[in-house]
């Protein structure tokens, strides 16, 4: 496995290193993505593909009276996220679980927000996964997607060759899959300079 495969599923020492790199490397994208939504401080949040846990920290800062759950299918990511958010976990404000987005291990309609930062590239069967996100969201809940690659930059295709199972989607492809999964109001934001996209979908 080449080192960059750890972006899909961090494993071993290389995976630990990758989670730290993702925490710092994706910080600006995350900050921009959060600027496109308003957050209820009492919210229940699920961060799917939580990686190293930096976005859990960000959510906790916005949901002081709520609860944030991180989920990843990588054991390394779960462990690193738990380590970074140990205090919040002890306080009962946070938990981090191992799970697959194609079969999210939570009941229907339990979250106000679900976020996916730099992760939908690796989801198996996009529409099925979006159906699962829709299922666990409360009515009126928000699904936030943030990607550093908007599918229009040919230079980004090098990553799909380096990382097995990675697929870069355009905003039109993501919006079509969201509509198919039952999301209603869908807004798309773009940072054309950096080829970033953020999509905010309401159940």
Language model segments and positions:
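Class I SAM-dependent methyltransferase SAM/SAH-binding core
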Residues: 44-103
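C-terminal alpha-helical "lid/dimerization" subdomain adjacent to the S-adenosyl-L-methionine
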Residues: 2-5, 10-23, 27, 131, ...
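Short glycine-dipeptide loop
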Residues: 42, 137-142
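A short SAM/SAH-binding and catalytic strip from SAM-dependent methyltransferases
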Residues: 113-126
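A generic alpha-to-beta junction signature in SAM-dependent methyltransferases
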Residues: 37-39, 62-63, 137
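Conserved alpha-helix/loop element of class I SAM-dependent methyltransferases that forms part
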Residues: 24-43, 58
């Amino acid at each position: 496995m080449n080192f960059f495969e750890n972006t899909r599923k961090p494993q071993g020492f290389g995976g630990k290193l990758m989670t730290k790199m993702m925490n710092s490397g994706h910080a600006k994208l995350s900050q921009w993505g959060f600027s496109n939504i308003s957050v209820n401080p009492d919210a229940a949040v699920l961060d799917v593909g939580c990686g190293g846990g930096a976005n859990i920290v960000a959510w906790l800062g916005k949901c002081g009276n709520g609860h944030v759950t991180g989920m990843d299918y990588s054991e390394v990511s779960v462990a690193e996220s738990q380590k970074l958010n140990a205090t919040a976990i002890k306080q009962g404000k946070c938990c981090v679980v191992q799970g697959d987005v194609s079969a999210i291990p939570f009941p229907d309609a339990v979250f106000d927000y679900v976020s996916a930062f730099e992760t939908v590239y690796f989801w198996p069967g996009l529409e099925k996964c979006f159906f699962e996100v829709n299922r666990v969201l409360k009515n009126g809940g928000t699904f936030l997607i943030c990607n550093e690659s908007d599918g229009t930059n040919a230079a980004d295709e090098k990553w799909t060759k380096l990382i097995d199972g990675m697929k870069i989607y355009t905003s039109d492809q993501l919006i079509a899959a969201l509509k198919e999964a039952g999301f209603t109001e869908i807004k798309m934001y773009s940072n054309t300079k950096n080829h970033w996209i953020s999509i905010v979908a309401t159940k």
